[in-house]
Amino acid sequence: MRAELCADLEEALRAGGHEVVRIERACFDIFVRTRDGRAYIVKVLINADGLRREVAEELRRISHFLEAVPVVVALKRHTGPLEKGVVYHRYEVPVLDPLTFARLVEGEPPKAVADRGGQYVVIRADEVDELDVSRVRRRQLRREGGRITLARAEEADVEGVPVELKTPEHVDTGRDRMTRFERRVAELLERMGAERTGKVRRAPFKLLAKDGETVLARAEEGGDRESIALRDVASATGSMGVIVTRERCKDTYVPTIDIGTLEEIKDLEDLKEYLQERDPEERVRRLVEEAGITSPREIAQRTGIRESVIREFLRRMGITDERKV
């Protein structure tokens, strides 16, 4: 059922013209870049109570570095089905039902927040004056920021102020969970100019660095599925995706660099230039566009890139055979 909910959500987002990256075996399921540039890190659950604290921390950490909003999309929690138009929270992560999230993505934010004692909305000062309550109660409401129950707002026919979902500002970066090799990579990125570095466990990337340019890195080789996911997230977020290895490694879907070469690079701008020059997809694209070559075997002979990797790049370019372009 969760897989079906993921698939339905992904289909609806793509149909709406938003950029979507589907992730498997990670702390989040979907990355969304809306048409107007807003970014969301989405975890899909049937029951929101299934969100564990450590997963919530990773959602917040990734969102912090990628300047995104973490969201859990679920159908219910222990008290019953999630109400439409209401924001719930679990471990500081907003929880929405699918329809409310779909409306949020389309620019219609929710207006109620679930809290102890019920569901509340915040109304404007002029709306407070319109309520049929005593002067004492009006003064109290102003002191409380105009927060009233959703039922009272509906009774008074006031809409309330939209709930703003924000990118987490203060998070545990997870540096204490880095391996020795990951810590060395993080130190080099900081020397190059990154102000912040962090570590996540359940994602196609394990290291994050931020200072103008966001770096998504993995200090180890991984499978093709992880590499494709790393590349897709980096592309959707405008980040640098890179795999850092102890020694030179086989080609992959993402630019790679060995630790010795990384130590010689001066700053993040030089790193970006280095990765762009060695980006395997760009190398394939240049051969297709400049030389008209679409044969995976011939491209492999010229570049040393694996044929399976080349076929995936050609598929993304809409080329399914070996004809000349």
Curated annotation (Swiss-Prot):
Residues 128-190 form the HTH cro/C1-type domain. InterPro entries: Arc_TR_HTH (IPR020886). Keywords: DNA-binding, Transcription, Transcription regulation. GO terms for molecular function: DNA binding; DNA-binding transcription factor activity. Residues 139-158 bind DNA. This is Putative HTH-type transcriptional regulatory protein MK1005. It comes from Methanopyrus kandleri (strain AV19 / DSM 6324 / JCM 9639 / NBRC 100938).
